[in-house]
Structure formats: structure tokens, C-alpha cells
């Protein structure tokens, strides 16, 4: 029976987290539906306003940069109707994420060392050496425990059948975890009944685990380790997150100008004099980290940092060179990596992907571009994506020209209808499409 609250709710166009296609409430959504029904739309809208006020008071924000490079600060949007994932589903997702990240770490270490996966013709070496994220200076080196990506953000979607699919791997500098943690705190404040009625899995331990992860990455044992979060600065879009994580872990938030290198050791400038730094959680891309080794124009990095890391005098997470696993061309081979390195079948499937540098697949993409989603292989944050069914003919032709000019830099995928969940709008509750970014911390079990 569809109640008054849900009478206008239409779940027929995608897999919905609350309702089946014939508008029957899913079992795991029964309790929350009863709570929402009892409150009614007016009360829910009041809670929503309280939620936004709390977000403003806590200073939760992010920056968006326009085409003219002007930054606009925005409040973090949070809808109070939660996405519910039953524990049985999450257990499978969790195992699949761990499996995937483990294989990716093994792959990165193999690429920079033995290169077995190339010799066995599982992954073509050309796609790695042509990746802008391949760092030749990392050749012959492994970080402690061979853990290259200590913090991984894996983007998941649910398709029309309700299956979880991996959409993207983010292994360089994955962002967004602070908003997840703050969302949970805000929801506990403004909607405590949800947490008394459901046995909600805790995420409060994340920053403790991140702290422990940093300690484990210190190359040499020390009684009193000093660790820092390295930020590009206050104008970075994720600066709120950088400061939040540093505060929660009780460690210093620093910019490149706060650090210096002497005798291949990293030091932090303090009022009491130089302080040796043992581990750095960096939130800068590789190219900006060290102007001596990489981009000479960088003014936000630390000259000499790479050499310190290679010599085992400082831990850096995520490790330099990890970006090769972010490449969307490499993404298409991850299922093969899982079989190759772990001898297991992938627990989580991924979206079918066409590689434009392979002629047969490129021809298919060009012929069917109006049906496909085309993505730059090495962009992030949704930049440069073309959704074929929605793009005008002129834009599609421009993308075709770009593919022909530089096929290695593009992949294409079928248009997946993302799952939906109820969202409070100005006048009603309506389904909205969504994805999910879980975070995986890799410790010594890698």
C-alpha cells in the first residue's frame, strides 16, 4: 500500500533503494518509511532546514572553480532521507572493494618492479608507459609493505537490475571522506531517531584508522613520530577536508612552504626550530610535490621531497606513482588483474568499457557515439565527459575529432541508468539518481 507521503513517488525509471518497480516498499525501508510518514512533509522540511543551518554553523563547505578560474564557495548539500544499504549487501561490497584494491596495489608494485603482468601479456605495457601518471623515477622502488595506495576511493553505481558496478577507481588523492563523516554527525544531531531504530554501522573510527595507517607507513621505527597533512593551500577545493582530517588526527596541517629538506630528511618549521617529519599525507598531485624532480614551476611542493621518500627517510601516502591505477584505460583491465594476481574471480563487476586506442573498438565508438558516454582517460571530477544521448550533434562531432587525434586519451561506456533514492525537494519527495564512493584504507595486510 502506497501511503500519502509516497503517493507521487515514481520508482519506475531506475532501480530505487526504497521501492520496487511496481511501487512496493522494500523490506529494509519499512522502518524509515514509517518514521517519515509519521513526521509528514512539513516536519521533514523543518528538519532539512535545521540540517542546513547546522552545516553552515560547522563551516562545512567546498569550492567550485569556474572556467575563468574564479572560486565560488558553496555550502555542502545534504538530504536527510538516508540511503539504506542492508548489511548483507554491504558485506559483499566490502569484500569486493578489498579484493579490488589489493589487486591494484600488487599491479602498481609490479609495474615499477618485476613487470610480470606485461611479460605474461595480461596488460599491454604501452598503455602504462603512455599514461601521464606513470612516474619513471619510481622504477625499482617499493614503499613499505608494497602498499602504494593506502587510501582508495572507489566509485560505485547500481544499474537497472540493482547490481553494484565499479564506475571508477580513485587512488591518487581521493577526496570526500570528510563530508561523509560530517554528514553522519549532522544526521545524529538533527534526526537521532534514525539511529535508535536502525543498527547503523559506525564510521567514527575512520580517522583513527587513517592515523594508524600513517604510523605504519613510517619507513623507520621511531618513538615519537611526527606526521603532517600537506595541503596546496586555502584556495584548494578540498581545503575543508584537509583541515578537518588534520584536526581529527591531531597532526599538523602544512603547506609546502612550511617544510624543507636537509641531508635528505624532511623538516617542519616551528617556533622552536626544525622538527623532523616522519610521514606525510599529501593532498597534492605528483607533479606539484617536488619542483626538483617534477614540475619545476611548482611553488606548492617541497624541493627534494622525492629523494627523501626514495631513500626511506619519510613515508608518503598515497605513494608517488600511484596514479597509473587511476587511468580509465587501466580500469578496463582490473578484472583481469584480480584473476592474475589473486587467482580469484572479481566479486564486483565493472562497467563495460571501449578503448579508443584499439581500432575496432574506436570504430564502434565513433559509429555509436550518440548512444555512449565518452570520458577522457585521465580527467577526474566529471570534467570532459560527453553523454552521447544528450549531447548536440556539434559536440559529438568535436569529441569524435578529439578521439581521432588522440585515441589513447579516451574511453567510452554504455549509458547506465543510475539507481535512485528518495530526496526532499521544495514541494515533495522525489527520486534522484546517485552513486557511492566508499573509502578503503590499506594497512600491512597488503
Which sequence ranges carry the predicted segments?
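Preference for protein termini
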Residues: 1-444
Amino acid at each position: 500500500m502506497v501511503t500519502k507521503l509516497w503517493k507521487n513517488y515514481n520508482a519506475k525509471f531506475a532501480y530505487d533503494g526504497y521501492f520496487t518497480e511496481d511501487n512496493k516498499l522494500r523490506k529494509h525501508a519499512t522502518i524509515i518509511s514509517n518514521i517519515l510518514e509519521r513526521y509528514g512533509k512539513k516536519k521533514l522540511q523543518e528538519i532539512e532546514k535545521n540540517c542546513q543551518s547546522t552545516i553552515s554553523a560547522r563551516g562545512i563547505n567546498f569550492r567550485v572553480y569556474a572556467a575563468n578560474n574564479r572560486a565560488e564557495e558553496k555550502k555542502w548539500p545534504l538530504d536527510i532521507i538516508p540511503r539504506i544499504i542492508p548489511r548483507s549487501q554491504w558485506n559483499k561490497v566490502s569484500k569486493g572493494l578489498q579484493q579490488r584494491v589489493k589487486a591494484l596495489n600488487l599491479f602498481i608494485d609490479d609495474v615499477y618492479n618485476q613487470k610480470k603482468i606485461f611479460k605474461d601479456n595480461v596488460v599491454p605495457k604501452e598503455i602504462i608507459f603512455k599514461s601521464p601518471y606513470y612516474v619513471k623515477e619510481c622504477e625499482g622502488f617499493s614503499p613499505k609493505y608494497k602498499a602504494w595506495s593506502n587510501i582508495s576511493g572507489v566509485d560505485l553505481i547500481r544499474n537497472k537490475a540493482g547490481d553494484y558496478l565499479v564506475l571508477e577507481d580513485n587512488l591518487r588523492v581521493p577526496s570526500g571522506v570528510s563530508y561523509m563523516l560530517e554528514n553522519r554527525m549532522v544526521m545524529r544531531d538533527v534526526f537521532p531517531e534514525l539511529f535508535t531504530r536502525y543498527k547503523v554501522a559506525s564510521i567514527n573510527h575512520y580517522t583513527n584508522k587513517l592515523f594508524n595507517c600513517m604510523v605504519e607507513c613510517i619507513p623507520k621505527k621511531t618513538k615519537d613520530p611526527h606526521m603532517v597533512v600537506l595541503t596546496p593551500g586555502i584556495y584548494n577545493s578540498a581545503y575543508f577536508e584537509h583541515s578537518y582530517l588534520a584536526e581529527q588526527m591531531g597532526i599538523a596541517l602544512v603547506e609546502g612552504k612550511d617544510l624543507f629538506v636537509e641531508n635528505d630528511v624532511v623538516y617542519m618549521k616551528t617556533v622552536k626550530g626544525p622538527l623532523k617529519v616522519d610521514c606525510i599525507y599529501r593532498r597534492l598531485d605528483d607533479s606539484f610535490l617536488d619542483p626538483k624532480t617534477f614540475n619545476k614551476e611548482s611553488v606548492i611542493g617541497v624541493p627534494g621531497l622525492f629523494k627523501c621518500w626514495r631513500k626511506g627517510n619519510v613515508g608518503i601516502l598515497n605513494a608517488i606513482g600511484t596514479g597509473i591505477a587511476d587511468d580509465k584505460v587501466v580500469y578496463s583491465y582490473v578484472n583481469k588483474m584480480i584473476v592474475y594476481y589473486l587467482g580469484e574471480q572479481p566479486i564486483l563487476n565493472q562497467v563495460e568499457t571501449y578503448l579508443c586506442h584499439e581500432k575496432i573498438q574506436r570504430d564502434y565508438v565513433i559509429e555509436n557515439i550518440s548512444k555512449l558516454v565518452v570520458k577522457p582517460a585521465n580527467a577526474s571530477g566529471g570534467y570532459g565527459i560527453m553523454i552521447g544521448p544528450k549531447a548536440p550533434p556539434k559536440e559529438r562531432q568535436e569529441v569524435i575529432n578529439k578521439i581521432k587525434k588522440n585515441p589513447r586519451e579516451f574511453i567510452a561506456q554504455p549509458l547506465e541508468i543510475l539507481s535512485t533514492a528518495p530526496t526532499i525537494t521544495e514541494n515533495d519527495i522525489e527520486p534522484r539518481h546517485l552513486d557511492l564512493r566508499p573509502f578503503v584504507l590499506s594497512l600491512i595486510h597488503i
